[in-house]
């Protein structure tokens, strides 16, 4: 991942209002950031932001009340040595939290070394939690997929398929049935956690749906505020296909999944043909997926009943084993 755009200046600009940050000194080091190696080796954002720790270099160091009190109890020699070690680590920047004054020696060393030094009245714990959440979003794996992303019955569903199969028309019908639009054509997905992928609409395409023959439709203006969503977790992919008779698997014995940012996402394939009510089929697929997430598998239950019936000697099942 390219980390060149993540530096002290960008982090300050994005969080100054939320964290009430003030840039005390070290403005010349605005380009300081994280090395690619430190980001690659980080198991989570906790490795990139934390309380003062001289063992972990190249991370955002936050000094709270406890760290400042410890500093004050040290001898002049120990203070100088600790400050020298801290600056030598070349952290992206330092934050003195809790509204306590920054030690004069720390300010002087940050000025001389062009190390950005921020201050905030907020507690160190609040600053660390907020910056960790921010870093996890910034550095999360991302991908842009083609399709129509909808909120159907509270589940994030991505409609995919070849061009011309009617994905946008199907999306429009589902919206008219009370479901919500997240994004059309291009959907930005980001993996924010170990078990979920979140999808959003690019700002340029917000609330828009393109339908052949009608052009661009502003869904929010036409259907109202409740017809659009800002984001949804991706739980199901519905792939629309057009295949000749005899080439479509009616009862797939194995659950289909698609890898999205390293996470397997359930997939359902629906054949497009004249006379088929695709909106009803998609809704049924979503309801069935909800049952499967609750541990209810209709096909597996049927196969279990079939096996028991075939093994029962008193059963009138026509295909029982003799």
From Swiss-Prot:
Q: What is its cofactor?
A: Mg(2+)
InterPro entries in the record: HPr(Ser)_kin/Pase (IPR003755), Hpr_kin/Pase_C (IPR011104), Hpr_kin/Pase_Hpr_N (IPR011126), P-loop_NTPase (IPR027417), Ser_kin/Pase_Hpr-like_N_sf (IPR028979)
Q: Where is the segment annotated Important for the catalytic mechanism of both phosphorylation and dephosphorylation?
A: 209-218
The cysteines covalently paired via disulfide bonds are none
The UniProt record lists the EC number as: 2.7.11.-, 2.7.4.-
Q: Which UniProt keywords apply?
A: ATP-binding, Kinase, Magnesium, Metal-binding, Multifunctional enzyme, Nucleotide-binding, Serine/threonine-protein kinase, Transferase
Residues that bind Mg(2+), according to the entry?
Answer: 168, 210
So where does ATP get bound? 161-168
What is one process in the GO biological process aspect for this record?
Answer: regulation of carbohydrate metabolic process
Q: Name one GO molecular function term.
A: phosphorelay sensor kinase activity
The protein's matches in Gene3D superfamilies, at most eight in alphabetical order, are given as: HprK N-terminal domain-like, P-loop containing nucleotide triphosphate hydrolases
**Record's miscellaneous remark:** Both phosphorylation and phosphorolysis are carried out by the same active site and suggest a common mechanism for both reactions.
| Domain description | The Walker A ATP-binding motif also binds Pi and PPi.
Q: What does this protein do?
A: Catalyzes the ATP- as well as the pyrophosphate-dependent phosphorylation of a specific serine residue in HPr, a phosphocarrier protein of the phosphoenolpyruvate-dependent sugar phosphotransferase system (PTS). HprK/P also catalyzes the pyrophosphate-producing, inorganic phosphate-dependent dephosphorylation (phosphorolysis) of seryl-phosphorylated HPr (P-Ser-HPr).
**Protein name (database record):** HPr kinase/phosphorylase
